[in-house]
Structures are given as C-alpha cells and as structure tokens.
C-alpha cells in the first residue's frame, strides 16, 4: 500500500491532523518497572499489515550571515556545498542492509530490524522518505544578544563563535537560546508559506552549526556544547482536530570536528530514526541508564529515543558508501538502539537477536535499569 503524503487527509490518531502512524506496546522485563506496559506510536503503517508508506521530507536549507559587533558582515556560511551530499545520503538513497531483501533507506532498515519478527519472508513493509527542497533561506546572526535571566537581570552574551574544519569549511558554535528563536521563526514561516506540512517530515538543515548553552558566569565564552540536532513538533491549539507539524533540526558535520565518526549526516540520521520511533515525543520507556556509565550512575532517560543510548559510544557511526556525482562517498549515519533494548529483556526478538542496528555489536545487551 503506497501513500501519497500530499493527498493524505490526516494521521491515525484521534484528535490530531498529522503523519500516518501505528500503535503498539511492550512490557518492561527488568528493574522496578517489570511488568509495566509502555505504549508507543511510530511512524508509518503497521508491520503486520505490510505495504509501503512514503513521507515527503520538506527541507528548508539555512545559510548564515554572521555579523561583527558593529553590524558589518564578518562572513557567510552557506548550506549549498552540502545540498547534493545531503540529498544523496543513506537517509534518502538506497543501500543494502540485512533487514531488507532489497536496497532501502537507512531509517527504514532500522525499523524493519526491530519488527523483523513480525514480517513474513519477503514481506514488502517499508517506511520511506522522499526529500524535497522547499526553500533556501538566510539568517543574519548578530555578534551579541541580550539575555534576561530568571532573576530579571539582563546580560549581554556572545551569540556565536567560529572556527575552521579540516575540509576548510567554517563551523559555527551558536548560543542555543538564540538558535531556538531562529528555528521557531523559520518553522512558522515555512508553515505559513505552505512549505512545511502536517503529513510530512519537515527539516531545517544547517551548515556546521552546533549549539552551546549560556555560560552565565562568563557570557562571552561558550557554555556546554554541542547539540547537533533535535526533533520536535509544532501545533495550533485553536484548530480541531489539532494540526501537528513534525519538525527537525540537523546540522551537516564536516570531518574532524568530533570523534566516534560524528560527521556528515550522522545528526540527520539520528533525528530521522528517532522521529520514526517517537514522532510525537510521547513514547515512554522504563528508566534506562546510559551505556558505559558506572553501575550506580543516575545518568538516565525514560523515553523511546533510539539514538541517544548510542551517541555516547565510541562506535556510534555505521559507515555506508554510496556514489555521489559518480564518485564514492562514505557517509556516517548513526547506529540505533532497537525497541528491544528498551524492553530490558535477556533476549531480543529483533533481527538476529539484536539490540542495536545496523551494527548489532554496539549494544550487546538490553538497557540497564536506572538505579533507584
């Protein structure tokens, strides 16, 4: 069954106009939540029904103009050099994976892996993305911005810092508070233009733009860094049924800036896979501890965010080589935790008994319950 998102009349959740989804649930198998049932809603058609669901991915490509303190232009940071590489990445182009008998896209391969036990041999169940560049915009970024603190005090903080990556590209560290303002405005503008839609994935793609938090005690130096992407949704509370626009931010990542293979489209693949598994951000999970933490650590989460458990590991990336402009290019999408990892069971009914995919060795066992 193929769906044309442009003609889709709405999602499958009562009271919402959004993407098509399917529902399920799992029971926690260890820890203080043993036996508790955790419902979920995921992107696409139910695996037991089969068929192929295709969602348009509306892409607004954002370039940056960075200003000096006096308002003159310091430099511009264009997205254009990364457009072709992004559109030809494993997020949108097919490659071979063990979870599919035919070449498919990266997030679809991961989703098929976690529901492999449900599929009949050769069953054509896929959730696919069709990229569409709907706009190319420029955002002007001032050198400083005024921030009102919780106590009412107003301080001036640096908005951005720049550097040069190994490939010669400019990278930008941007204050997250200011970025959130820019991102929200951009999404709302695209919604008002009709470019971002409720039955699609909607992406604001940035060039080497990494977010840092405010350093209150030293506002002219960056705080904690770096956020490379996130996924969320926008909604209109005045309309019934309520429209929800799935909205993603992801940065292109030039090589050499981060470890663990964090480069090119890793952030984009992370956010797309999490949008597949938790599109509306309300999929809970038993409290799980981040891998690699000491046994008594309470560095934990309690949601079905499949990229987060892996992003902290040294082997987060899964290299995939595709041809771009008749030349091989090796991409680095991120390995993902499978649904079975969050179940905290001793075994997994995912493909090959795996807890992660495509590299099944990244997470050799299920999640450890968060210490109480």
Describe each model-derived feature in a short phrase.
Residues 1-102, 331-372:
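N-terminal module-boundary/linker segments of secreted carbohydrate-active enzymes
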């Amino acid at each position: 069954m193929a769906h044309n998102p442009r003609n889709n009349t709405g999602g499958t959740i009562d009271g919402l106009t959004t993407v098509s989804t399917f529902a399920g649930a799992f029971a926690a198998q260890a820890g203080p939540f043993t036996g508790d049932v955790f419902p979920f809603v995921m992107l696409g058609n139910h695996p037991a029904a089969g068929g192929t669901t295709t969602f348009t991915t509306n892409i607004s490509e954002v370039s940056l103009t960075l200003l000096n303190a006096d308002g003159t232009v310091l430099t511009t940071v264009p997205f254009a050099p990364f457009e072709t590489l992004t559109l030809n990445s494993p997020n949108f182009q097919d490659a071979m994976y063990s979870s599919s008998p035919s070449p498919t896209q990266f997030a679809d391969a991961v989703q098929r892996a976690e529901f492999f036990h449900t599929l009949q041999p050769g069953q054509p169940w896929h959730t696919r993305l069709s990229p569409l560049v709907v706009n190319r915009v420029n955002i002007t970024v001032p050198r400083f911005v005024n921030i009102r603190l919780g106590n009412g005090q107003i301080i001036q903080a640096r908005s951005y810092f720049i550097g040069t990556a190994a490939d010669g590209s400019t990278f930008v560290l941007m204050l997250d508070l200011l970025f959130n303002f820019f991102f929200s405005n951009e999404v709302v503008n695209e919604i008002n233009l009709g470019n971002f839609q409720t039955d699609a994935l909607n992406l604001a793609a940035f060039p080497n733009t990494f977010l840092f938090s405010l350093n209150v005690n030293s506002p002219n130096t960056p705080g904690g860094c770096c956020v490379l992407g996130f996924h969320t949704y926008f909604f209109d509370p005045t309309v019934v049924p309520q429209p929800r626009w799935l909205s993603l931010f992801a940065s292109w990542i030039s090589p050499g800036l981060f470890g663990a293979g964090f480069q090119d489209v890793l952030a984009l693949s992370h956010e797309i896979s999490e949008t597949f598994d938790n599109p509306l951000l309300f999929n809970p999970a038993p409290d799980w501890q981040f891998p690699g933490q000491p046994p008594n650590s309470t560095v934990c989460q309690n949601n079905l965010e499949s990229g987060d458990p892996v992003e902290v590991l040294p082997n987060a990336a899964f290299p995939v080589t595709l041809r771009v402009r008749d030349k091989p290019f090796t991409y680095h999408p991120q390995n993902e935790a499978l649904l079975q990892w969050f179940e905290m069971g001793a075994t997994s009914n995912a493909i090959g008994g795996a807890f992660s995919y495509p590299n099944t060795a990244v997470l050799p066992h299920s999640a450890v319950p968060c210490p109480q």
